Amino acid sequence: MTNHDFIVTTQWSVGRDEVGLAKGDVINESISIPSSLGGVGEGTNPDEMLVAAASSCYIISLAATLERAHFNDISINQESVGTASLTNGKFKMEQIKHQPKISVEASQKEALEKRLDKLLKIADNNCMISNSIRGNVDIKIEPYIL
């Protein structure tokens, strides 16, 4: 087994109406409670970062999966939506829905349509974030081939 450590440091001052900082090797972002939840809404927030992590992981995994399947001349634009709920006073991410729009050459479109379901599952199974949250968060994938 190989382990990889991903180190992020966070800073916060006392109180919910403050702005903190999340810092890693590349990330350097202000963080706060979103305004939709009564916070100051400056910078990003953990909910958005969770959806961004899931989305970026999935799109990278999907691109690699398509490349290995010899679909080389493609582009992917994806929107991901995280749906959270408040139940018994606790917030929980219930679902993350990925909607990848895959542009492919006309000559490869039919072949991709035939193999797409299997390739989507492979990509999801190779995504570390999907593997980490599966069972706690419902992951939906609604692809479009352009």
Locations of the language-model features?
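Extended beta-strand/beta-hairpin segments
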Residues: M1-A52, I60-L146
